Amino acid sequence: MIVLCGAKNRDIEGIKITVLDVGQGDGIVLSGKGKNYLIDGGSSDVKQAGAQRIEPYLLSEGIGCLDYVFVTHGDEDHISGIRELLEGQKLGVRIDTLVLPPEEYHDEKLADLARIAVENGTRVVSVKTGANIYGRGERQTEKNDSKEVMRLRCIGPLTDIPQGLTKPKAGNEASLVLEFSYGNFDMLFTGDVEGAGEELLVKSDVLRKYEILKCAHHGSKNSGTAAFLEKTDPRAAIISAGIDNRYGHPHEETLNRLKKRKVKTYNTQTDGAVTIKSDGIQISIESFLLSK
């Protein structure tokens, strides 16, 4: 099966990012400049998150094809819905390319997902740290002075480890970390990165300041350290977690670290899906539900 994606979704002025409410998991849709992306898609407490949460949203937005689906790591709460989309794309939303972390960080779950993708006509690639993906028709170069350029850049996991730092293990620590920019707007997507993986990002100086942070690992205690927040200095943060989840996410310590820095925090538990829109200058953030 050959997948050809076109800009058939509803016309978007600028970019639109929606952190879907998939319960205890992640599912993020990014649209703009003629392209549609999905960053992770799964849940550990919502059955058929792909068919019941992700695909209905995509279709409601007029998105019949995803140019890229990024998988930060192989945990079920990040890939269960993607598996459903891959297996059902002959009649549903099509996926052009599945993007995985660097090969040295692959595990059995990622290998199995890649196999399913190939069997269903989806191209599979492993992204390298430093790689850039641009909007449709934009120059595929690092030097691009247009303020309206949309770029998604892979900044982690690092494969060249500086001396004295620990290489992250496959899984959460080696999550794909993506930096998105459009004009003066930028956002950081962190998967479940924590521990050695997060420390490596901080100490290797690949991080910078971002308007919005997608909090790692559903707001767990061991992610989003004070040092990490000092580097990224977000104005707003978004946490994706399930109601009454057995892990206690988001952790009180993480919320306190964000509060201490006066970061406006959104949580899908109470806010439902969270949508960010930007024309490259102004930013709006809307939640599906009203927080209590």
List PLM regions with ranges.
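Non-globular, low-confidence helical/coil segments that flank catalytic cores
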Residues: 1-292
